[in-house]
């Protein structure tokens, strides 16, 4: 089976909420010699992007998102050990504090980005979902003086708006200059990042890892 055919099957498994079949497809792909990173970036993440777009367009709703998320989680259980094997050694890229915005419990992209950052040499502090901005600021303050990257995600426009409040709080607490700030999620755009004074965004988890490394140079 050609790699593109494998990637298409992985994409469709996520879009069609194939909870049981997705991890099996991942095992088959690994057995065929496809790298775990490619399975994620060229197959699963493509499916998640489609799911996110459909959700934004109100073509699917929360139950479908959750089922696609479960399929993704099951896939990552198979792939995370493979990513760990290939983890980049050497100097730590920095500390990534990852979280999902207050009012948002959609953690699919968040978990994927967190895994990818860990695989690319970042130490991880995962604050989880529905995180208050004051908790993010508090965590950032604990690590003042270190190389810190805040990585927040929001699937909904309403929760995305809290990212501006977070930037304001970081400025008020005089922490903004000591951290880099990166936000992602379906509604987040380059224009929004510029408007709130953050540092970066990314289209998907693999790109997020690359952008994060660039931002932390």
UniProtKB/Swiss-Prot annotation:
Q: Which InterPro entries match?
A: Cbl-bd_cap, Cobalamin-bd, Cobalamin-bd_sf, Corrinoid_p, Met_Synthase/Corrinoid, Meth_synthase_dom
* Gene Ontology annotations of biological process type: homocysteine metabolic process; methanogenesis; tetrahydrofolate metabolic process
| CDD domains named in the record | corrinoid_protein_B12-BD (cd02070)
| Residues annotated to bind methylcob(III)alamin | 106
- Quote any Pfam family the record assigns: B12-binding
- Where is it found, in Gene Ontology cellular component terms? cytosol
Keyword RNA-binding on this protein? no
Its pathway, per UniProt, is: One-carbon metabolism; methanogenesis from methylamine
A molecular function (GO) held by this record is:
methionine synthase activity
Domain (B12-binding) ranges = 93-217
Keyword list (alphabetical) reads: Cobalt, Metal-binding, Methanogenesis, Repeat
Q: Where is the B12-binding N-terminal domain?
A: 1-91
Q: Which NCBIfam families match?
A: pyl_corrinoid (TIGR02370)
Q: Indicate the family of this protein.
A: Belongs to the methylamine corrinoid protein family.
Annotated function: Acts as a methyl group carrier between MtmB and MtbA.
Q: How does it assemble?
A: Can form a complex with MtmB.
The entry's protein name is: Monomethylamine corrinoid protein 1
Native organism: Methanosarcina barkeri
The lineage is:
Archaea, Methanobacteriati, Methanobacteriota, Stenosarchaea group, Methanomicrobia
